């Protein structure tokens, strides 16, 4: 209520009455402050009020009350009016007595609030004396207990450190009181000190109430923190120790675990405790080392058990290493080659004697001590110790870059040097031994007195902390004499335990901002030096604590980010690292504020005067010393040392003037700030100078002049110059003081005295600089010096005198060497494996280094022998079984050493004979090559040749490729197998499997070098005949992928050659002149040589890649449909090969084949390209290009010297054969010379009809010339290869086309038959020549060119036909035809897979034409042509392998047409109707479908018309005699009668015919002619109409004119279109009736036709004109011959054009080609055969197709004579 009333005064001014009432209430409640507030509010109303209230003057009574109130508050002096005040109070009490209950509640509330703000701290101690640690812990514990739980939980998640727990309390602590118990008897203290110490910790932990959450772990619960820290550390160590061997066994490739731990908090623990823990952990590690080695997982133990069972405990003897001894003897023989010339004694020791000493020799092992040490660690490899040491200098950790690793190396060296800088930081025992413990000053009585003073004058909690901090940190002046009169400071003059220091540090960090503000306020008022000293000493102590904390956090961060920590498996937590970094930033900000405070403070005083005071001098030196430490920790760039050096010099000058006692300031309680003395300052000066010098080296910027830095490090490390002279000659800058020279001498001495790690790190940095600056010569010199240093050190007393760390040191040295030698080899690789030849380097220095390298080679070869022994005997344990990482590292170092030895050996050998690198004789090449081969054989046998990322393989490849490839082709093949994993066999040699990893990928440089070796291997045998194996194909593919396609845009010459090539192919026509020039080698292409970097392509890379792709394409083509994209890629490769001006005949040859395959691909899959002439142009152009490429191949082969170039002889035969076949395909069907007519670039030609672009012109050569060229080419091919039946087969066909005599043709075909029989596979025989022989003999005999007896002789000589009745005389042609039928059946039976269709067709044709056996002919042809619904296609035939492309579609047309003839002859109307839908869908499987469709439709119509006795003018006569009106009326009446009465039986066949014709019309719509179909439909309907006209009495007789309504009106005539609606209505009406009829009578069509034919025969009306078959044939004869669409010329024109071209090119053809010796006689006319009798049988299919010219000749003859003439001049298209 009171609060509300007071708040209300804020919003609105109160009147005087209200204020007086409030005054009385507050006075009654004894709230003097509130009463004063109301009176002051009332008095100030006149000045502050904006209302009328301000105009009323203040009453004097109010002022009187205010005076009395001030007197009660002791603010003013009492006056005589005290009685008035007393009376006033009594009146108020009486007036407000009714508020007594409220007053009581109010007072209770005030008392409770006061109690909450007062804290009583119970000081608990049972020990002998009270100490500040327990006091501070009790205070912290109490404050922690008062914390608000919700705030604690919320802030615990934020993990905020150094937070004052007072900030989390619920109520302010305005008063602090201490409860101090009475101490117990001293005797009990002596017995229970240890017990109470532990109880104190336990009580501290257990007194925390339940549910209380600890917030500030570091500040509020230190004991618990220490326990957690120690437990975590022990747990981590245990896990590391237990898991190290297990992890190494489970995954040998993992990094070895190092037993290092990380700090869990940035607050350092007690140094004594930590040191004790380190000592204990080391002892535990030593004691547990043995069981740690045995610890492994079950899986590893099981594996070890298995290995122990497999490897017996065999005794290792010298006989186990016979190969090694032989190998070393071989190596010594190589060394002897220049030992004689150079008078040296380079030799290798028999290391087998070292590894297996002789038993009879009682002397100790003669090997050096480090060799025995090496053998010891090999057999007893300690992963934890040795692996870490082996990799301690590794600058290429996984996942890091070279620059990053170099930085790590620098950081590591700086850490070591920083340790060196701290070597003088330890306390001076003489000066520090008198420092007492804090308990000697702060006794129990002193602390109790201090606490009693606090109780007497209660203070705020923060004020209490400041009082305690001041007492412990600031200057103290004792009042008594028992401690002397000198002032002292507890933080510097006494030794604290770490727990007290940690508590004070926490309080300092928590309160430093409050202290700083307080000191600043006091500093403004401080005038005297004595008062200032108190604050100054306090400030300096605070500053020292902050600096010490800052350095500790900084060291922790550096430890977590250091290289050693990164190598452990416990990676730093990013969140933890971020939190610690944030703490570092916070402490840094605090330090900056305090530094500014000191600067402000020192500016306000006279420093020189103040320094005269000893106390001020001490505190000033302490400040400067801590300031220097802060700057050193913050300064990471040691080049900028000027400021620190100046501060050190200043401090040194100040302190050197004092006495020794005064000049020594102990600082015993700081971990990172050592004591102040002259020696410690000098040590810091020296350390800073050294770090500055090395910083110039470590952090020298690239691109700047770093000669001084490099020279410094060279002076320190390289021992080929005097150190003193080097220092004097060193061009030091002016800034470098005398300390630099002293520091340089000191660091050299320090490196000599310190462990070898320092020198190894220094070498690493020196080599890093050489590497980064690409100073190869210096790197080589440094490497040689480093090798000398390593051997010197390993043989020194320093190494031999090591105890406990000897083996680890050996591993470190060898690991450092391994790293340096690999960097050196990388530079050698860039320098083409050549050593630097500086003027100061002599042969003696090379020999010295080589001899030292041989020592290292012997050492590391012992590792290989040891691994071999581990495979033999279980007494030897492989390093790999312990640490795969170490095993791989040793392999790398071993291989690197071998590689360096090869390089130095090569250098020495050439120096011995004094030759240049470019003039190495073959003997030297052979020696070096043999050395490499021996090394590779030995290393490969040991399965280590691929180590060091294939370094040795790379070296060997680069050296051997530069030598004669023929000498080392097997070794190069082995190198390719090991390095690139491409196994290339050479003759009988196959590379051995060395079980290597793929260590390299081909690049352009390596591809060019290896192609010079690989491509000649491919050409050892003609690749066209002996295609390289698949292993070579993989390698060629890799080469091509690296080289890629030509870049025409960047090379003008290549672009020109490419354009020239394209123009040549696109614009060249095949003329007789072009044929002549190519056959005589006169054709030239003006290609220019491309740049010199195209050697690999000129060597045949593109050609070989195209050849291999072509070979695989041919294999896939047999099983699956080929892809044009593959051929396009092949064409591109071959074209690119020619564009590089190779003029390679084989490339032209393969190009011709590739284009030929494209032509075949266009022709064999669909007939689209053959049905439309325009579509054939593209295919013809491809065929033209194919022929041009073949001719260019012939042109190039003619240029070459065939007699000397043996591989070309076999190629010429294949070239001529394939060329002749392609040209034959171009000249014959289906292309029909089209390739000689087309041109890819259309020409603009003026014609009589107008100018136009023309793509097809007349043929450039005649067919006769083409056939002669083909014949001559086949003769050349046969001379080259006489066992290819296709050559003879095609030659016989060409000879027949050239009208050679039948005997010549059949003799050639006989040879083809014999070869084919010999080469046939029983499961897939060759039947083409055998069938061709039967077909030709049949044709020759029928046309009279060959006698029957001669034909029988040829049939008898065929091994497949083998006609046994050859002696039988033949008197009649029918007998001969029967023999032909038997021979064809024999050929058919010879076809096991039933793929060939031509013999069956020929057999069916002979049966039909010669014997009239329609049924048997149908049975034979039915295997090809099928009307069954199960067969989707009409004609089902396979394409035999040797069938020419495109002929397939001609055969399908031929067979389908013949089938139509058979069905028509058999008057099988059902078969013809069933053929309609299948034929309609056959557009893609045959040519001339429209013609065949027309034939089929006309055959069906004519059979139906003949059956219904419908002649040609039947419909016209009916329409002219019938009136339109009458017909339409009668037709409607007809439909109505049929609906009512049903379909009469006599008209059922008419409706079925009408249904069939209507369906045929639908299929024919838009496809073929419709006049005959429409006329037939109308005729059928007329027959139905006439039937009803006769049967119905209501209809008028036919022919009665329809009366017109008007004489002047013109009568409408009846047309065919008037019938179609009626027909449609009739079919719709009786659709179901028709379906039922066809279902019940499926043979109704053929039955009706048969009955009609019989009826005609009975009526005697059978005549020639009425014979259906003859009529169909005569109608077919009158039709035009089916012509190939693209050749719009008949046979007469074709022959005339050919003869014309033959006449024009007679002279050229005679000079190009020579006729064969077996030319046909001049008179090639057809001889009359007495056995040839004209046959009057039905026309054949071929006659209907190809005899238009003969039809014209016999147009005037009678039909019978015409038929006989056609049969006598028969030509069969199946001969193609």
UniProtKB/Swiss-Prot annotation:
Keywords: Chromosome partition, Nucleus, Transcription, Transcription regulation
Protein name, entry field: Histone transcription regulator 3 homolog
Record region (Disordered): 180-218, 241-260, 1709-1776
Gene Ontology CC annotations of this record: HIR complex; nucleus
InterPro entries recorded: Hir3/CABIN1
GO BP field: chromatin organization; chromosome segregation
UniProt biased composition (Basic and acidic residues): 190-206, 1716-1742, 1766-1776
Family: Belongs to the HIR3 family.
Origin superkingdom: Eukaryota
Subcellular location: Nucleus
Function: Has a role in a nucleosome assembly pathway that is required for the integrity of heterochromatin and proper chromosome segregation.
Native source organism of the sequence: Debaryomyces hansenii (strain ATCC 36239 / CBS 767 / BCRC 21394 / JCM 1990 / NBRC 0083 / IGC 2968)
Gene: HIR3
A molecular function GO annotation: nucleosome binding
């Amino acid at each position: 209520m009171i609060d509300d009333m007071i708040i209300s005064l804020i919003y609105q001014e109160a009147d005087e009455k209200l204020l007086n009432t409030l005054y009385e209430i507050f006075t009654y409640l004894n709230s003097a402050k509130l009463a004063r507030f109301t009176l002051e509010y009332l008095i100030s109303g006149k000045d502050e009020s904006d209302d009328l209230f301000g105009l009323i003057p203040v009453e004097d009574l109010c002022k009187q009350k205010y005076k009395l109130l001030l007197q009660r508050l002791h603010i003013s002096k009492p006056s005589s009016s005290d009685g008035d005040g007393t009376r006033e109070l009594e009146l108020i009490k009486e007036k407000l007595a009714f508020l007594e209950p409220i007053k009581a509640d109010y007072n209770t509330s005030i008392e409770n609030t006061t109690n909450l703000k007062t804290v009583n701290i119970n000081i608990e101690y049972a020990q002998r004396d009270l100490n500040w640690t327990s006091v501070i812990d009790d205070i912290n514990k109490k404050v922690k207990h008062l914390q608000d739980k919700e705030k604690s939980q919320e802030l615990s998640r934020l993990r905020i450190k150094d937070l004052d727990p007072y900030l989390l309390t619920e109520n302010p602590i305005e008063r602090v009181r201490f409860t101090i118990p009475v101490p117990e008897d001293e005797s009990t203290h002596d017995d229970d000190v240890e017990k109470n110490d532990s109880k104190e910790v336990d009580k501290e932990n257990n007194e925390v109430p339940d549910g209380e959450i600890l917030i500030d772990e570091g500040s509020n619960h230190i004991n618990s923190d220490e326990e957690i820290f120690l437990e975590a550390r022990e747990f981590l160590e245990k896990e590391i120790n237990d898991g190290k061997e297990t992890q190494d066994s489970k995954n040998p490739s993992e990094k070895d675990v190092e037993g290092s731990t990380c700090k869990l908090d940035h607050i350092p623990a007690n140094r004594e405790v930590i040191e004790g823990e380190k000592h204990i952990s080391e002892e535990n590690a030593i004691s547990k080392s043995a069981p740690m080695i045995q610890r492994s997982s079950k899986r590893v133990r099981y594996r070890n058990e298995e290995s122990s069972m497999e490897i017996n405990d065999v005794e290792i003897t010298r006989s186990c290493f016979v190969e090694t001894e032989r190998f070393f003897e071989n190596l010594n023989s190589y060394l002897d080659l220049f030992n004689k010339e150079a008078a040296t004694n380079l030799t290798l020791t028999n290391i087998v004697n070292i590894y297996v000493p002789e038993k009879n020799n009682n002397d100790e092992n003669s090997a050096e001590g480090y060799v025995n040490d090496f053998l010891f660690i090999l057999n007893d490899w300690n992963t934890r110790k040795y692996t870490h040491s082996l990799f301690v200098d590794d600058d290429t950790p996984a996942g890091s870059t070279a620059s990053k690793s170099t930085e790590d190396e620098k950081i590591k060296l700086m850490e070591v040097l920083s340790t060196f800088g701290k070597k003088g930081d330890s306390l001076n025992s003489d000066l520090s031994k008198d420092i007492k413990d804090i308990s000697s000053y702060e006794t129990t009585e002193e602390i109790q007195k201090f606490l009693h003073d606090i109780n007497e004058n209660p203070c705020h909690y923060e004020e209490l902390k400041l009082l305690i901090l001041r007492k412990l940190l600031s200057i103290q002046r004792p009042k008594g004499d028992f401690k002397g009169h000198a002032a002292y400071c507890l933080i510097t003059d006494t030794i604290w335990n770490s727990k007290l220091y940690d508590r004070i540090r926490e309080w300092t960090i928590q309160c430093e901002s409050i202290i700083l503000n307080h000191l600043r306020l006091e500093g403004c008022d401080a005038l005297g030096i004595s008062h200032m000293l108190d604050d100054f000493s306090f400030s300096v102590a605070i500053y020292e604590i902050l600096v010490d904390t800052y350095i500790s956090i900084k060291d922790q961060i550096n430890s977590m980010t250091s290289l050693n920590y990164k190598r452990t498996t416990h990676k730093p937590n990013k969140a933890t690292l971020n939190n610690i970094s944030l703490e570092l930033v916070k402490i840094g900000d605090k330090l900056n504020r305090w530094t500014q405070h000191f600067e402000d403070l020192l500016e306000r005083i006279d420093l020189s005067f103040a320094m005269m005071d000893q106390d001020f001098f001490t505190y000033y030196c302490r400040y400067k010393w801590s300031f220097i430490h802060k700057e050193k920790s913050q300064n990471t760039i040691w080049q900028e040392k000027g400021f620190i050096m100046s501060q050190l010099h200043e401090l040194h000058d100040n302190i050197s003037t004092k006495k020794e006692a005064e000049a020594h300031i102990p600082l015993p309680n700081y971990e990172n700030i050592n004591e102040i003395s002259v020696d410690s300052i000098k040590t810091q000066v020296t350390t800073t100078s050294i770090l500055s010098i090395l910083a110039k080296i470590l952090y020298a910027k690239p691109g700047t002049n770093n000669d001084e830095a490099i020279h410094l490090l060279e002076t320190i490390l390289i021992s080929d110059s005097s150190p003193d002279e080097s220092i004097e000659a060193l061009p030091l800058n002016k800034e470098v003081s005398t300390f630099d020279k002293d520091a340089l001498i000191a660091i050299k001495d320090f490196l000599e005295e310190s462990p070898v790690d320092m020198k190894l790190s220094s070498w690493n940095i020196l080599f890093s600089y050489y590497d980064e600056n690409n100073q190869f010569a210096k790197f080589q010199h440094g490497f040689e010096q480093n090798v000398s240093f390593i051997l010197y050190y390993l043989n020194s007393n320093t190494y031999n005198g090591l105890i406990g760390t000897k083996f680890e040191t050996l591993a470190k040295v060898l690991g450092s060497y391994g790293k340096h030698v690999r960097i050196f080899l990388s530079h050698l690789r860039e320098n083409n494996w050549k050593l630097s030849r500086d003027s100061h380097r002599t042969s003696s220095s090379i020999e010295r280094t080589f001899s030292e390298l041989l020592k290292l080679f012997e050492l590391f070869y012992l590792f290989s022998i040891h691994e071999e022994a581990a495979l033999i005997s279980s007494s030897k344990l492989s390093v790999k079984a312990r640490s795969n990482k170490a095993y791989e590292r040793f392999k790398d170092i071993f291989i690197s050493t071998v590689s360096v030895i090869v390089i130095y050996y090569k250098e020495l050998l050439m120096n011995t004979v004094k030759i240049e690198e470019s003039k190495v004789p073959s003997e030297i090449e052979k020696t070096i090559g043999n050395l490499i081969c021996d090394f590779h054989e030995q290393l490969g046998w040991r399965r280590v040749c691929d180590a060091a990322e294939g370094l040795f393989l790379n070296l060997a490849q680069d050296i051997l490729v530069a030598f004669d490839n023929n000498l080392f082709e097997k070794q190069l093949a082995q190198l390719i197998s090991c390095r690139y994993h491409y196994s290339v066999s050479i003759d009988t040699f196959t590379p051995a499997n060395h079980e290597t990893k793929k260590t390299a990928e081909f690049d352009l440089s390596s591809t060019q070098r290896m192609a010079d070796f690989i491509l000649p291997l491919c050409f050892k045998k003609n690749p066209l005949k002996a295609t390289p194996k698949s292993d070579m194909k993989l390698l060629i593919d890799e080469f091509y992928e690296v080289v890629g396609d030509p870049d025409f845009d960047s090379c003008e010459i290549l672009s020109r050659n490419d354009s020239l090539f394209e123009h040549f192919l696109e614009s060249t026509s095949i003329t007789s002149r072009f044929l002549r020039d190519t056959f005589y080698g006169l054709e030239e292409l003006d290609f220019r040589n491309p740049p010199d970097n195209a050697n690999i392509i000129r060597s045949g890379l593109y050609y070989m890649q195209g050849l291999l792709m072509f070979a695989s394409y041919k294999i896939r083509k047999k099983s699956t449909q080929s892809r044009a994209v593959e051929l396009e890629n092949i064409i591109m490769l071959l074209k690119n090969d020619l564009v590089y001006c190779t003029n390679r005949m084989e490339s032209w040859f393969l190009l011709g084949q590739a284009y030929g395959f494209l032509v075949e691909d266009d022709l064999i899959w669909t007939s689209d390209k053959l049905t439309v002439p325009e579509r054939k142009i593209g295919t013809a152009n491809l065929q033209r290009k194919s022929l041009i490429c073949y001719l260019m191949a012939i042109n190039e082969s003619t240029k070459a010297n065939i007699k000397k170039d043996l591989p070309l002889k076999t190629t010429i035969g294949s070239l001529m054969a394939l060329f002749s076949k392609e040209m034959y395909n171009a000249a014959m069907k289906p292309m029909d010379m089209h390739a000689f007519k087309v041109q890819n670039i259309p020409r603009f030609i003026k014609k009589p009809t107008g100018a136009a672009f023309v793509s097809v012109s007349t043929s450039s050569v005649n067919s006769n010339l083409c056939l002669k060229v083909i014949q001559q080419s086949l003769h050349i091919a046969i001379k080259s290869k006489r066992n290819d039946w296709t050559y003879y087969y095609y030659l016989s066909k060409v000879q027949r086309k050239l009208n050679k005599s039948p005997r010549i043709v059949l003799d050639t075909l006989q040879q083809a038959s014999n070869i084919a029989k010999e080469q046939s596979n029983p499961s897939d025989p060759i039947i083409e020549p055998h069938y061709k022989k039967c077909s030709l003999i049949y044709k020759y005999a029928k046309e009279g060119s060959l006698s029957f007896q001669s034909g029988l002789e040829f049939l008898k000589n065929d091994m497949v036909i083998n006609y046994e009745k050859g002696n039988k005389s033949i008197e009649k042609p029918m007998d001969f035809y029967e023999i032909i039928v038997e021979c064809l059946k024999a050929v058919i039976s010879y076809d096991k897979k039933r793929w060939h269709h031509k013999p069956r067709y020929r057999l069916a044709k002979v049966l039909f034409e010669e014997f009239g056996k329609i049924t048997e002919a149908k049975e034979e042809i039915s295997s090809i042509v099928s009307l069954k619904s199960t067969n989707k296609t009409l004609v089902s035939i396979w394409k035999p392998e040797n069938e020419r492309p495109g002929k397939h579609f001609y055969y399908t047309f031929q067979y389908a047409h013949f089938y139509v003839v058979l069905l028509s002859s058999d008057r099988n109307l059902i078969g013809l109707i069933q053929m309609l839908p299948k034929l309609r869908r056959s557009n893609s499987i045959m040519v001339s479908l429209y013609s065949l469709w027309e034939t089929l439709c006309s055959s069906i119509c004519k059979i139906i018309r003949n059956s219904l006795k419908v002649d040609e003018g039947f419909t016209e006569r009916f329409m002219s005699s019938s009136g339109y009106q009458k017909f339409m009326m009668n037709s409607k009446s007809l439909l109505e009668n049929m609906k009512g009465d049903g379909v009469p039986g006599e008209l059922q066949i008419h409706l079925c015919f009408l249904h069939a014709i209507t369906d045929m019309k639908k299929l024919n719509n838009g496809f073929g002619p419709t006049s005959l179909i429409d006329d037939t439909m109308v005729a059928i309907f007329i027959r139905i109409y006439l039937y009803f006209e006769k049967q119905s009495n209501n209809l008028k007789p036919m022919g009665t004119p329809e009366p017109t309504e008007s004489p002047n009106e013109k009568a409408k005539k009846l047309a065919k279109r008037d019938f179609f609606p009626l027909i449609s209505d009739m079919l719709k009406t009786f659709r179901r009736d028709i379906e039922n009829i066809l279902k019940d009578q499926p043979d109704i069509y053929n039955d009706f036709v048969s009955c009609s034919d019989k009826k005609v025969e009975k009526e005697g009306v059978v005549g020639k004109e009425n014979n259906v078959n003859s009529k169909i044939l005569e109608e077919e004869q009158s039709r035009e011959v089916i012509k190939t669409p693209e050749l719009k010329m008949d046979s007469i024109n074709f022959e005339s054009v050919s003869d014309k071209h033959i006449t024009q090119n007679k002279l050229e053809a005679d000079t190009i080609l020579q006729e064969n010796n077996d030319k046909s006689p001049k008179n090639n006319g057809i001889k009359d055969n007495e056995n040839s009798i004209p046959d009057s049988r039905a026309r054949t299919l071929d006659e209907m197709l190809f005899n238009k010219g003969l039809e014209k000749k016999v147009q005037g003859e009678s039909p019978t004579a015409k038929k006989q003439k056609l049969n006598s001049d028969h030509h069969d298209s199946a001969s193609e």
